[in-house]
Design a protein with these regions (language model features):
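Interfacial aromatic "cap" segments that immediately flank transmembrane helices
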Residues: 2-33, 64-91, 103-156, 190, ...
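Selective recognition of hydrophobic, aromatic-rich stretches within alpha-helical transmembrane segments
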Residues: 31-61, 86-126, 165-201
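Juxtamembrane "helix-exit" motif on the non-cytosolic side of transmembrane helices
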Residues: 156-164
Length: 206
């Protein structure tokens, strides 16, 4: 079982996000510009799950890949997967919130495994749970560090604007900064996927 190192995940994730910044950023922008289009939006939502996988494999990202017809073929199965996760999260919330967070980390790889490995909904959830076993809190802290860093930078920018009595501008700047830093979040996911899935497969072959 691979054990994640929180600081290595953050550091390497930032490198991956930075090295692929514009391709990831353009992909995310393209996704949000077209997410309102019925039917197509399901395919692009499935495709966007592949983004961190491609980064983990070191592949070059072409933003228009999200429109490939192959992603729409498994629309029904994907909706089943997302539906199961959503219902379980809601139930977890009513059991004291903490189960919801545990499930979100345990199943964090499910959508990527669904797209990359062609697993069905239950297989993806089971495999994700197995792969993240013993690493859930490491994943949590890696995400927390990145999230806090992004919010801190955005908050400072918004605070400066507010101090200059440009409160509306401050909010706009805050959201823009958060959006601009999204590629680094994808980089973090890529390192987690690479460490827990791809490197594990390589070690098993050897």
């Amino acid at each position: 079982m691979n054990k994640l190192n929180v600081w290595s995940v953050v550091k390497d994730g930032a490198k991956v996000g930075g090295a692929n910044y514009w391709s990831v950023f353009c992909t995310v922008i393209l996704y949000f510009l077209t997410v309102w289009i019925p039917y197509l939006n399901v395919g692009t939502t499935i495709a966007i799950q592949q983004l961190s996988v491609e980064l983990a494999k070191g592949n070059r990202i072409k933003p228009t890949y999200i429109f490939a017809a192959k992603y729409r073929r498994r629309m029904g199965e994907f909706l089943v997967l997302e539906g199961i996760m959503l219902i379980a999260m809601i139930v977890g919330f009513f059991f004291g919130v903490i189960p919801m967070f545990v499930l979100s980390m345990a199943w964090g790889l499910a959508s990527m495994l669904f797209v990359d490995k062609g697993l069905n909904a239950l297989e993806a959830l089971r495999e994700s749970n197995n792969l993240t076993y013993g690493n859930k809190w490491r994943i949590f802290w890696a995400g927390m560090i990145v999230g806090l860093a992004i919010c801190l930078l955005a908050g400072i920018a918004a605070g400066v604007c507010a101090a200059l009595e440009y409160k509306v501008l401050g909010l706009v700047v805050e959201y823009i900064l958060i959006f601009l830093l999204v590629p680094f979040a994808y980089g973090i996911n890529a390192i987690i996927y690479r460490s827990l899935v791809l490197e594990r497969e390589t070690s098993e072959v050897e």
